[in-house]
Structures are given as C-alpha cells and as structure tokens.
C-alpha cells in the first residue's frame, strides 16, 4: 500500500506501508491536515478527526 505522508495536498511525497490502510488527521479548519500516514490510529479522543481508508485516494 502506498500512502501520502505530507500535511498538505500540494506535497505529493508518498511512503510504502505494510498496512492495508492509510489515514489523515484533520482539524476543524477546512483543508488543514495535521498528519498523514500508514495504518489507522485508534485513539478514541481523536477518532472523529482521523479518516482511514483502504486506498491512498482518500488520503489526498
């Protein structure tokens, strides 16, 4: 699986992951992404802010 690893959509760096999911951690501000990467973090406190998917496309 290949996931994006940068915080902004303009950066196109990717990483290769063993996991079959990617995630992005977003804020309440539109378009602001704090982190992207492999897997799907399960922290309950951040759950509504973390979007996980089985494709790098939803990590854009």
UniProtKB/Swiss-Prot annotation:
Disulfide cross-links: 3-22, 17-38, 40-52, 53-58
Segments traversing the membrane: none
Protein name: Toxin 4.9.6
Keyword 4Fe-4S tagged: no
Cellular component terms per the entry's GO annotation: extracellular region
Keyword presence, Secreted: yes
UniProt xrefs under InterPro entries: Snake_3FTx, Snake_toxin-like_sf, Snake_toxin_con_site, Toxin_cobra-type
Tissues where this protein is expressed: Expressed by the venom gland.
Subcellular compartments: Secreted
Major place of residence: secreted
Family: Belongs to the three-finger toxin family. Short-chain subfamily. Orphan group XI sub-subfamily.
Gene Ontology terms for molecular function: toxin activity
Keyword annotations from UniProtKB, A to Z: Disulfide bond, Secreted, Toxin
Signal peptide: none
Xref: Pfam families: Toxin_cobra-type
């Amino acid at each position: 699986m290949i996931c994006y690893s940068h915080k902004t959509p303009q950066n196109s760096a990717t990483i290769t992951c063993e996991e079959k999911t990617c995630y992005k951690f977003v804020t309440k501000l539109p378009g602001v992404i704090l982190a992207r990467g492999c897997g799907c973090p399960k922290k309950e406190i951040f759950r509504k802010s973390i979007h996980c998917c089985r494709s790098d496309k939803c990590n854009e």
